A protein has these predicted regions:
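Conserved short alpha-helical segments that host acidic/polar catalytic motifs at enzyme active sites
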Residues: 1-245, 249, 258-291, 303, ...
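Glycine-rich oxoanion-binding loops at beta->alpha junctions
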Residues: 49, 66-83, 269-285, 308-344, ...
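Acidic/histidine-rich
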Residues: 152-186, 460-486, 521, 528
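Glycine-rich, anion-gripping cofactor-binding loops and their flanking helix/strand elements
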Residues: 179-201, 326-361, 499-533, 566-580, ...
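Extended hydrophobic-aromatic, low-complexity segments
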Residues: 181, 304-305, 321-322, 351-354, ...
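Active-site phosphate/pyrophosphate-binding segments
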Residues: 259-263, 267-294, 384-513, 587-607
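Glycine-rich phosphate-binding loops that contact phosphosugars or nucleotide phosphates
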Residues: 288-437, 517-522, 526-561, 582
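Generic C-terminus detector
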Residues: 540, 566-607
Length: 607
């Protein structure tokens, strides 16, 4: 969602804050702004749209100051425009904020009764006025922080700057991440280590409920009980270099093409092919005695969890339940004593998933996480962390993070199946050998660029698209539909192929695209019947199958993409690639913003 950066230095902080904002672009945003302290006054520039527009404002009216804050906003309260862009200012007070202040309406009414004039629709402006209210009454920075934290309900990361205190920033976090950076004669605060990496590698993470007073040469942290504490300082492994697109047109294109390599990296972390040995992290329980595993995730990661259910139940004979993170806490699910919960999140900061994790911990579950960012809140609050080696994923729509999640989940399933005595060494080798060959098959699919382009050209004018799959590839159909919606803004729905006759078939008419994910497996003949039904009603079928499946069809669709033959167990990883490619090329045809689709954010840090 929003991105925050703040800095105290002994030279102009504007270039460094701009660099930090650029590195936060991947989170998604619709406006940006910077405020600095200059000779005892606050100076601010804001712009709707991309950071390039903010840079244009800064060229016209430069900023200079040794203390400053910056922000990229993704609208929640108030439309995306300059007026609602952060930082928000009230007199000498400037505030940037990520999250949602749930009681902002009550606070707004109270502040208006005190004479404050509201200029925006945002909840953040309320915070700025609240800080000014306490500042005007002579409270010290420490007392101001205690007072506002007592008044605010909801989730937030806040950085506050007061002109009367040059060289000082105040910050607080509740269910939204903040990191502190230590530089040479400089201090930093930001949403994550990625934003701070160009300036410093020395990072300290605030824990939930922490608040802090930051000066150029000192830092004081208090916990949620207002007790002064220290938080460990570590050297971040995040690169300070700004990640580029290289030879690719978009980050998504680059990340799609990186999948053969990063899946290989992830496999090497969990499996040694020379000894046929699984290298999964040790857990504090016996997988053989585990009564149930609950998998919790959101968006694309939820579909990875659905596929993992097939693997864990089929291979390890382990009861698995898969929950949407935003629903998990609200249905009083049955979590047995000694059970475990696995939380999947690319960023490790998805707030729905984080809150679900805390709920599961309160219910006595062993906590495992599968993340791509090890310096993340979910990772720090887990008992065991499985790390995908996808590298930074910048495009909002997930590609390589998803397929590396699947690779890691299949490794976990094989490992636990072996520990639960349902797989012998020979069967482990068969599955893992097939998985190890997968990068070669993925590279083969990537070589067919021209036909994907041609198919996308024909489908780009569609109003609606249906995706169908069975068994392990039912979630692939769901993921394909999600990718198309995210990137091209075409309405798409994914269904289990066997459900077509139970409603979705009513949508079929002449020319409607139907994407069928149908490797030749035990379910193929039934899926082929669905294909015939779609063709009989004039549907434009796009078939994704292997040579054996294609040869068994009497009626050939207009578009047939022959996929490499793989073991059905690993097919969801392979078949993720064509649905990504189809969505990408259709988005190119439609001219949408592939890397930052409208209204979407990379890291969803509000509920």
């Amino acid at each position: 969602m929003c991105g925050i950066i703040g800095m105290i230095g002994n030279t102009s902080v504007v270039p460094s804050i701009l660099e930090g904002l650029r590195r936060l672009e991947y989170r998604g945003y619709d406006s940006a702004g910077i405020a600095v302290l200059n000779q005892g006054t606050t100076d601010r520039r804001r712009a709707a749209g991309k950071i390039a527009k903010l840079e244009n404002e800064l060229r016209k009216k430069p900023l200079d100051g040794n203390t400053g804050i910056g922000h990229t906003r993704w609208a929640t309260h108030g439309v995306p425009n300059v007026v609602n862009a952060h930082p928000h200012v009230s007199g000498s007070v400037s505030v940037v904020h990520n999250g949602i202040i749930e009681n902002h309406k009550q606070l707004r009414e109270e502040l208006v009764s005190f004479g404050f004039a509201m200029e925006t629709e945002t909840d953040t402006e309320v915070v700025a006025h609240l800080v000014k209210y306490y500042h005007d009454r002579g409270l010290t920075p420490e007392k101001i922080m205690r007072a506002i934290i007592d008044r605010l309900s909801g989730a937030y990361a806040l950085v506050i700057m007061i002109a009367d205190y040059p060289g000082m920033l105040m910050a607080a976090r509740k269910s939204s991440p903040l990191a502190i950076g230590f530089g040479n004669n400089a201090m930093f605060v930001g949403s994550d280590a990625l934003a701070l990496a160009p300036m410093t590698r020395r990072i300290s993470y605030l824990e939930d409920g922490d608040w802090t007073i930051i000066n150029r040469d000192s830092l004081t942290i208090y916990n949620s009980k207002n007790v002064q504490v220290e938080r460990p300082v570590s050297l971040t492994a995040v690169s300070g270099a700004l990640i580029g697109k290289g030879k690719y047109r978009h980050f998504m294109d680059k990340e799609i093409h990186e999948q053969p390599e990063v899946i290989g990296y992830t496999l090497s972390a969990f499996y040694d092919p020379n000894s046929n040995y699984m290298k999964m992290p040790e857990v504090a329980f016996n997988p053989g005695l585990l009564p149930k595993l609950t998998i919790v995730a959101a968006g694309t990661s939820y579909y990875a969890g659905m596929i993992a259910k097939y693997w864990l139940e089929g291979l390890a004979r382990l009861p698995v339940e898969v929950d949407i993170a935003s629903e998990f806490r609200y249905r009083n699910s049955v979590l047995p004593d000694g059970g475990a919960a696995l939380f999947i999140s690319q960023s490790g900061e998805s707030l729905d998933t984080l809150m679900a994790l805390r709920h599961a911990r309160e219910r006595g579950q062993h906590i495992i996480s599968l993340i791509n960012v090890d310096e993340s809140t979910i990772a720090r609050e887990s008992d065991v962390v499985l790390k995908t080696l996808a590298g930074p994923e910048i495009s909002v729509a997930s590609t390589k993070a998803y397929t590396t999640q699947l690779a890691a989940l299949l490794c976990l399933s094989v490992d636990w199946a072996q520990k639960r005595k349902f797989l012998d060494k020979k069967k482990v080798f068969e599955i893992m050998d097939e998985l190890s060959r997968l990068p070669t098959a993925l590279a083969e699919v990537l070589a067919d660029k021209e036909r994907w382009n041609a198919c996308a050209h024909e489908l780009a004018g569609a109003r609606d698209v249906i995706y169908l799959g069975r068994g392990l590839n039912f979630p692939t159909a769901l993921e394909g539909a999600l990718k198309l919606k995210e990137l091209s803004y075409i309405h798409a729905e994914g269904y289990a192929a066997g459900e077509m006759k139970h409603g979705p078939i009513a949508l079929l008419d002449e020319g409607m695209p139907v994407v069928m994910v149908a490797p030749y497996d035990e379910w193929f003949d039934k899926t082929a019947s669905n294909l015939k039904e779609a063709l009989a009603r004039g549907g434009r079928v796009v078939l994704l199958s292997d040579k054996e499946g294609i040869e068994r069809l009497d009626d050939k669709p207009a578009w047939v993409f022959e996929m490499p033959k793989v073991n059905p167990m690993v097919s969801p990883i392979l078949y993720a690639l064509p649905v990504q490619l189809l969505a990408y090329y259709i988005a190119l045809e439609k001219g949408t913003d592939v890397d930052q689709p409208r209204n979407l954010a990379k890291s969803v840090t509000v509920e």
